[in-house]
Design a protein with these regions (language model features):
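Structural signature of tandem-repeat unit edges
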Residues: 1-11, 18-36, 48-90, 100-113, ...
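Ankyrin repeat structural motif
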Residues: 93, 264-273, 295-304
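Long amphipathic alpha-helical scaffold regions
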Residues: 114-139, 284-313
Length: 361
């Protein structure tokens, strides 16, 4: 890979990259100096290379993959994934302008300065991964503010991880012809979720509080990823929020289980088991779907889980019956004691009366 760059007072600024792979990983150091920024239009196909690369320095590294293959500029639709080093602090304006195939972006919480229009035209971007090395603040809010589509965000803290979903949001003008009224119709809860940041820090309690709104406005697959993501990676998840996510899965188990079967998502079917959320109705719905799709592995797993569920249910019922029988037996014993006590008392009273009568005679 070849990288054109310029030296600045504090470090290196990336100008342009050339290579053969759609995944671009920027080094943290070039010629012994830290890489601290990426220039405007650095990954855009709209850069005037002849003008902007004048007097630029060249850094080159070979990994053996280029043999017999011609390098090309890594910009526009030729870029699908970019990994920035933890040293990078700034990206310039319109840096990804027109990168229509860019899907993943990885960086650290050092990246705080985001140039205007940085993500213009990045309609395929779907995932951000942020290495949180310094605290809880990041440049994610500014990035999300430029994109309307659903974005999955992974925050990687020192010892924990948070996997979040920021749903899509858009509005459209709808005309009511008879009334001659034009009004705006809003779709998706993404706009509200993007407001959960305060001073560049995500408020997880506010994020979880919005789930009720998401249930009313977003699609099943979005809600599944949100709820399972929070339950599996419960960073700053309160007990109340945890129960809200569990309750959503429990109430919609039939639809969710069918969706997971169609996605062949064994992992999340196992999560339902570990969270003890299965019901007979939900598991039968999943079994029916797996059977129709001839998913033998999934069917075997679900049949085993169903058997365990039936056994546990029967065990609970047996325990309840035993408790009832023990309770009834205790009641009968107590009743017998009371009757015996009453009989003894009556006998004593009768003797007392007879003594009184003899005394009177």
């Amino acid at each position: 890979m070849k990288i054109y760059y310029r030296e600045k007072s504090a470090g290196i600024e990336i100008l342009r990259c050339f290579g053969i792979e759609s995944r671009v990983e920027i080094p943290g150091m070039i010629d012994g100096k830290l890489v601290i920024s990426a220039a405007p239009y650095a990954f855009s196909s709209h850069m005037d290379e002849k003008e902007d690369l004048k007097n630029a320095s060249l850094w080159e590294v070979s990994d053996g993959l280029e043999f017999g293959r011609e390098e090309h500029v890594l910009a526009g639709n030729d870029v699908e994934e970019i990994v920035f080093p933890y040293t990078l602090k700034e990206i310039g304006r319109y840096i990804f302008y027109g990168c229509g195939n860019l899907k993943k972006l990885e960086f650290s919480d050092s990246l705080m300065q985001i140039g205007c229009g940085a993500f213009t035209g990045c309609h395929a971007l779907e995932k951000l991964t942020i290495h949180m090395r310094q605290g809880k603040k990041s440049g994610v809010k500014e990035m999300l503010g430029e994109m309307w589509q659903r974005i999955d965000v992974n925050f990687l803290y020192e010892y924990e991880e948070a996997r979040l979903v920021f749903p899509e949001h858009y509005d459209e003008a709808v005309e009511n012809t008879p009334a001659r009224i034009l009004y705006t119709e809003y779709h998706g809860s993404g706009s509200n979720y993007r407001q959960c940041f305060y001073d560049k820090e995500l408020n997880y309690q506010e994020y979880d509080r919005l789930f009720e709104m998401a249930v009313a406005m977003d699609k099943l697959e979005v809600l599944v990823d949100m709820s399972f993501g929070r339950l599996e990676f419960p960073y700053e998840l309160t007990g109340k929020a945890r129960e809200n996510y569990r309750e959503y899965i429990r109430k919609n188990l039939g639809d969710i289980a069918e969706y997971l079967v169609k996605q062949e998502d064994m992992h999340r079917l196992e999560v339902i088991s570990s969270q003890k959320l299965w019901t007979l109705e939900g598991i039968d719905s999943a079994l029916d779907c797996a059977s129709k799709r001839k998913e033998t592995e999934v069917s075997a797993f679900l049949m085993n889980e169903r058997a365990n569920l039936v056994d546990n249910t029967a065990g609970s019922e047996r325990i309840d019956v035993d408790k009832l029988q023990n309770s009834q037996e205790a009641d009968r014993t107590e009743q017998g004691k009371n009757e015996q006590s009453q009989t003894t008392e009556k006998s004593l009273n009768r003797r007392t009366i007879l003594r009184k009568k003899r005394f009177e005679l």
